[in-house]
Regions:
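Peripheral/terminal regions associated with large enzymatic or DNA-binding modules
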Residues: 1-95, 99-387
Length: 387
């Protein structure tokens, strides 16, 4: 028996984005189904332009529902209510109005939801695939590929996601017991800085505290057009990624220590065995985003730390952790024993990270890149001063 399937469009007042999203949904391969539920969930923006469009729109793949609100809900409250559609439908795909999907979206979403339905370590399924480090946006994110089509990341997703009741209900229960976001210096600092209107930081926090992961495709079936809206004053292309087209059958990895798995800092997990260490005594900080207050006895990093360096690796293979896994000697990645202090100075080696990430040793290019980094940093400082 086929599971019921709903697509929830999270709408406000951007009619152009809705039309673009619908044009992509019309081209999705629904495997011959004509019972795909399309839900327009429209927050109150003081205008009925989206509602009027939704009423006239003809959805060719099944029933259409329109939900409106008498009062403004705000993004956080609105999306949390959309998640509750998992009480009515077996599988729910949630899409904001600046998202665009590929024709493989349904087949991936359905197969993934079915495969991981009873896996308690999975909190949700992402349609999107990061190509940049979500904590250092100028760095690339390159997960190790394998025979399967997906990997695990301890980061929730809002740029195209799949929920089921078994995944959503535990999160809502946790949220009811944790309604306030308390800042913590052990979590990614971006979460502490996101506005109160963010629902995603709560879902991320849930994954971190409960040790749960999202399933991510290596090649995305959704992309983010980043239209101007509540969180951005202008349209940008920074979040656009390549899309998978024409794929009909996906292979999914079982959740285990042998799977490709990354934590909330986008650092590879379970590297201890390659270093002769227990994972419980190893902190991986290749990208320089892990707070040093979370360091365990051994730290694997590109930075220079004031501790005894017990091993060194090169930075040649991709992804970076593969140099450690294959034992490539060098001088760029260091393993430190924090129980043995040394009279050395800490040195941030972000320049090396960026050189590796942009795949260039051209110092003129790197100089321009450094200027851009400084410009962004000063921009952030100005914004904080204004606040």
């Amino acid at each position: 028996m086929m599971r019921s399937f709903a697509i929830v469009l999270i709408c406000y007042n951007r009619i152009g984005g809705i039309k673009r999203l619908l044009s992509s949904l019309e081209n999705v391969d629904y495997d011959g189904r004509t019972d795909i539920n399309l839900i327009f969930s429209i927050d109150n923006s003081g205008t009925n332009v989206v509602e009027n469009f939704a009423k006239k729109y003809n959805w060719p793949y099944g029933p259409k529902t329109i939900r409106t609100f008498n009062e403004r809900q705000g993004l956080k409250k609105h999306i949390l209510q959309c998640g509750d559609y998992t009480e009515q439908y077996d599988i729910v795909v949630a899409l904001e109005d600046d998202i665009y999907v590929s024709d493989s979206m349904y087949l991936y979403a359905y197969q993934a939801a079915e495969f991981y339905e009873d896996e308690d370590n999975v909190a949700g399924i992402s349609l999107y695939s990061f190509q940049k480090n979500w904590l250092k946006w100028l760095l690339r994110f390159e997960p190790q590929h394998c025979e399967y089509d997906t990997y695990f990341l301890k980061v929730a997703q809002s740029w195209g996601q799949v929920w089921t009741n078994k995944k959503w209900k535990p999160f809502k229960l946790w949220l009811s017991n944790n309604p306030e976001f308390i800042k913590d210096n052990t979590i990614p600092q971006a979460l502490n800085q996101w506005p109160e209107s963010s629902w995603l930081k709560f879902h991320d926090r849930y994954c971190i505290e409960k040790g749960k992961y999202f399933v991510y495709p290596y090649v995305a079936v959704s992309t983010n057009c980043s239209d101007a809206g509540e969180h951005s004053k202008k349209t940008v292309t920074d979040h656009q990624v390549e899309l998978m087209y024409g794929k009909k059958k996906y292979r999914f990895s079982q959740f285990s220590n042998q799977a490709i798995m990354y934590d909330e800092f986008m650092e590879r997990e379970h590297l201890g065995k390659y270093l002769g260490l227990s994972d419980d005594e190893l902190s991986v900080c290749l990208w320089g985003t892990r707070p040093n207050c979370t360091y365990k006895r051994y730290v694997l990093t590109i930075d220079d730390l004031p501790y005894e360096c017990v091993r060194k690796f090169g930075l040649f293979l991709r992804p970076a952790e593969l140099n450690v896994m294959r034992g490539f000697e060098g001088k760029d990645i260091k393993l430190y024993d924090t129980s043995k202090a040394r009279n050395e100075h800490y040195k941030n080696n972000d320049f090396l990270r960026y050189r590796y990430s942009i795949r260039s040793s051209d110092y003129r290019t790197l100089a321009r890149f450094s200027i851009q980094m400084l410009s962004l940093a000063f921009g952030d400082i100005k914004m904080k001063i204004k606040r």
